[in-house]
C-alpha cells in the first residue's frame, strides 16, 4: 500500500496532453482523500488552496498532465454561482458520495439535479464514486444509479464502487477516465470539424 500510495495513482500523460478533472461532492465524502491518493507524497505541498468566492476555497494542483480541483458542495447555489465556470471547463467530473450515509443521498440527488439543470456536465464525462463501500450499511451501485436517476444523462457516465480506506476501486476509476476522455475528446473534435 505505502509504495503505490507514495508514487500516486495517476499515470503521467503524454507530453502536450492535459485532462482537466473536477472532484466535487458533499462534506466528508472523500474528495480530499481521493486527491491525495491521486498524487505522489512529495507533491502534496504543491496543492494550492484557492479562494474562488467569499469564504469558498477549492484545492487545486497540476500533476503529470492532470489539472485537478476539488471542492465541497455545501449549498445548492454553489453550483450555479461559484463552481459552474470550473465545471464547464472540466473534461471529467467526479461526484463523490458517502454510500454508507443514507441521509446524504437526498442532498446528493438534489446537487446532481442542479448540475443537469444548469448544464454543467453536458460537455464532460461524469463519474459518480460510491465511496465507503467497505461499510456494512452502504448502498449498492445499482440502488445508487436508480435513486440518482443517472440514466437521464446523455454524456458518458458511470457509477463505480470505491473504498479509499482499502484503496479499492481507484485503478478502475482511472482506467475508466482515460478510456472515456479519449473517446469524448475524439467525438468533440469530430463535431468541431463538421461545423
Curated annotation (Swiss-Prot):
Q: Highest taxon of the source?
A: Eukaryota
Its keywords, alphabetically, are: GTP-binding, Lipoprotein, Myristate, Nucleotide-binding, Protein transport, Transport
Indicate where a lipid (N-myristoyl glycine) is covalently linked. Answer: 2
Which GO-annotated molecular functions does the record name?
Answer: GTP binding; GTPase activity
Q: Which GO terms describe its cellular component?
A: cytoplasm; trans-Golgi network
InterPro entries, sorted: P-loop_NTPase, Small_GTPase_ARF, Small_GTPase_ARF/SAR
Q: Where does GTP bind?
A: 25-32, 72-76, 131-134
Quote the PROSITE patterns the UniProt record gives. Answer: ARF (PS51417)
One record GO biological process: vesicle-mediated transport
What does this protein do, in the record's words?
A: May be involved in trafficking events within the endosomal system.
Which family is this sequence assigned to?
Belongs to the small GTPase superfamily. Arf family.
PANTHER family reported in the protein's UniProt record: ADP-RIBOSYLATION FACTOR-RELATED PROTEIN 1 (PTHR45909:SF1)
Stated name of the protein: ADP-ribosylation factor L
Q: Give the taxonomic lineage as stored in the record.
A: Eukaryota, Amoebozoa, Evosea, Eumycetozoa, Dictyostelia
Q: Which gene encodes it?
A: arrL
Amino acid at each position: 500500500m505505502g509504495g503505490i500510495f507514495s508514487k500516486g495513482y495517476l499515470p503521467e500523460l503524454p507530453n502536450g496532453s492535459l485532462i482537466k478533472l473536477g472532484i466535487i461532492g458533499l462534506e466528508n465524502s472523500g474528495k480530499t482523500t481521493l486527491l491525495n491518493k491521486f498524487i505522489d507524497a512529495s507533491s502534496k505541498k504543491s496543492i494550492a488552496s484557492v479562494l474562488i468566492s467569499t469564504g469558498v476555497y477549492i484545492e487545486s494542483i497540476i500533476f503529470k498532465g492532470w489539472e485537478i480541483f476539488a471542492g465541497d458542495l455545501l449549498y445548492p447555489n454553489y453550483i450555479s454561482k461559484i463552481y459552474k465556470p470550473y465545471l464547464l471547463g472540466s473534461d471529467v467530473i467526479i461526484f463523490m458520495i458517502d454510500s454508507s450515509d443514507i441521509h446524504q443521498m437526498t442532498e446528493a440527488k438534489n446537487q446532481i439535479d442542479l448540475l443537469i439543470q444548469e448544464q454543467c456536465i453536458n460537455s464532460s464525462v461524469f463519474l459518480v464514486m460510491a465511496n465507503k463501500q467497505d461499510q456494512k450499511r452502504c448502498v449498492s451501485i445499482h440502488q445508487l444509479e436508480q435513486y440518482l436517476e443517472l440514466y437521464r444523462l446523455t454524456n458518458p457516465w458511470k457509477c463505480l464502487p470505491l473504498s479509499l480506506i482499502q484503496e479499492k476501486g481507484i485503478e478502475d476509476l482511472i482506467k475508466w477516465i482515460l478510456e472515456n476522455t479519449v473517446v469524448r475528446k475524439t467525438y468533440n473534435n469530430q463535431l468541431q470539424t463538421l461545423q
